[in-house]
Amino acid sequence: EAEKSAGREIAIMIDTMGPEIRTGKFKDQKAFLVQGSEVIVTPDDLLGDERKFSVTYDYICTDLKPGDRILIDDGLIELMVTKIEKNDIYTNVITGGEISNNKGVNLPNKKLSLPSLIDKDIADLEFGIRHKLDYVAASFVRSGKDVLEIRKIIERENSDMDIIAKIENAEGVENIEEILVLADGVMVARGDLGVEIPPEEVPVVQKKIIKQANIIGKPVITATQMLDSMMRNPRPTRAEASDVANAILDGTDAIMLSGETAAGKYPLLSVVMMDRIAKKTEKEMGFFEKNENFIPLKNTIPDSIASAACRLSRNLEAKAIITSTTSGSTAKMVSKYRPQSRIIAATPSERVYKKLKLVWGVESVITSQNDGTDEMIRSAVNTSLMEGLISNGDLVIITAGVPVKVQGTTNLIKVEVVGKVIVSGSGLGEGTISGRVRLVRDPAAAGEIEAEDILVSYSTDKDYVPLMKNAKAFVTEMGGLTSHTAIAAYSM
């Protein structure tokens, strides 16, 4: 319904709960932990109070040792383990406060014996597959093995849903390279990540993850508390505006709002503000110059083609880079170089069309299936024209693969001026000119030539000069550097 009312197609991502640890139930729904007091934490099922409460993790007694920390409710409450006796973990309250049912529990810097997927994750994943959703945001991914467990279910159901691995703990950060190889993208989920690792490490980790995702050509989302104050206030803090801008400058593909739009007082204003910050950052901060010399650590033929296409587009000031793609991989490769030219992904797949919504700078169009390279390129250009993404006379860079319909074979670059070639000849000026053609046989009867007109005649003489001065360009059949047209052009 939202798509129809807005006239825009969107991609949809489902977020899994992941293998979380939470507090159990309390006698009065809550309790207050006093700083300096002792409280016992146990995996046993019981109604908790200020002296003892339960958590939903059976192996907590074996995974912890004296000196370890337990953080509750996004780190608002901190406990220090003093001793462990059977199923009872004795702790000292370092930071007290109110604790209640089902609050999140974090065990910083610990490798936990949690499953990759819980039953609810599997049910949610199957729901997303049935409804043909585009991505699954997999929570608390710790290693490539976790990604493969999710992939196994997706492939079992014959789905092509993309996996976005949420990096939310120290294990995920440590194993980011193998996660990036196996996932379709990553999310820097800074909420839980900022509890699991020291807050001062989060900015550095964010930059490293974004850089590694950029190098491999996988989309990366930066999320959590980006405009947190706008849950309550109509304007963000200056620090939040800088945070959004810096994520963009780091190279993130997407910036994500969560609580601001899900539960905040100003959801629409939050979106508008984030959009304004993003556009201003890319326009004013040397964003494209910063990325134009980006060199990946490992070159492949498709990657080299993408790099060359971006350099060509910059040198020729092309209006667009059109990538004919069946899987979307070529468009992702082009995107990572952050070209100034528009990136158009022409694909026959509606699934790929939607999934590319997440990739920086890519606008997708649906084309027909084609068996030949020329037909595929023509279809891509014509569809882009019909969608209003390019115009006749625009110079575009086109990438494609031969043979057609084979993924990962991008090996062709073509430079083309959009439009049907009626005549060709030699030009004296630079750049591309488009306008309304005015065919003139008699200058005295031509009437007024307007600034957007292109004057066309067999030849010119002194009587044509007033018309030529007003015209945007002129074309004559009688050529040569010593012709009247050429001499007049050089003198203007």
Please identify what each model-predicted range represents.
Residues 1-492:
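Non-catalytic helical/linker scaffolds that mediate oligomerization, partner binding
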